């Protein structure tokens, strides 16, 4: 494997880094009390990737097994215990554990420990996942979509349930 073709060919380099302080408020609070920090969105990275810090409350939460056709996802546990599904088995993910899921890989995550837990979620390329998570939070809070609208929503957001 070699490096990709250059995406920048200037000589002096650029001062274009983006800094986000640790105390930045979360962009999303779920009905369960968990929060999401959009550390880097697909928009802010020019579509290269997205990176979220996902803080799960003690209440059980997390999606059912599913897959994506257009993005890979990676999960890195920072604190607590998070159940990670690798397509065949649920694994107790503890701090420092990592799960990479290529496109098409069935996966899921849950917090059933009764304690808060935190992980990083990285997806590439940088799809606009913010609307997906914000809408599913509203659905968990009582938003009702027709079966047709719900099916279209999941397809639009590259989520296929298993």
What is each stretch, according to the model?
Residues 25-65, 71-72:
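A short glycine-rich, His/Asp/Glu-containing loop-to-beta-strand
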Residues 130-162:
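Acidic/histidine-enriched, glycine/proline-rich intrinsically disordered or flexible terminal extensions
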Residues 53-57, 67-86, 122-124:
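Short, conserved beta-strand element in jelly-roll/cupin
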Residues 21, 88-106:
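Short acidic-glycine-tyrosine-enriched beta hairpin
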Residues 62, 68-69, 82, 98, ...:
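Hydrophobic small-molecule pocket/channel-lining residues, especially in calycin-type beta-barrels
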Residues 83, 103-130:
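Ligand-binding loop in jelly-roll beta-barrel domains
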Residues 44-47, 57-61, 81-83, 90, ...:
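Short, charged/polar surface micro-motifs in flexible loops or helix N-caps
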Residues 1-40:
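Long, hydrophobic/aromatic N-terminal blocks
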């Amino acid at each position: 494997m070699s490096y990709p073709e250059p995406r920048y060919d200037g000589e002096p380099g650029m001062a274009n880094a983006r800094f986000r302080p640790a105390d930045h408020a979360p962009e999303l609070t779920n009905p369960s009390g968990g929060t999401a920090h959009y550390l880097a969105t697909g928009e802010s990275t020019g579509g290269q990737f997205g990176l979220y810090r996902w803080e799960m409350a003690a209440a059980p939460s997390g999606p059912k097994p599913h897959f994506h056709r257009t993005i890979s996802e990676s999960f890195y546990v920072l604190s607590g215990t998070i159940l990670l599904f690798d397509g065949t088995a649920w694994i107790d993910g503890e701090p420092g554990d990592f799960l990479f899921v290529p496109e098409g890989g069935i996966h899921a995550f849950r917090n059933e420990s009764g304690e808060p837990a935190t992980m990083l979620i990285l997806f590439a390329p940088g799809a606009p996942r913010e609307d997906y998570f914000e809408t599913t939070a509203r659905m968990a809070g009582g938003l009702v979509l027709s079966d047709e609208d719900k099916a279209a929503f999941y397809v639009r957001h590259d989520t296929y349930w298993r």
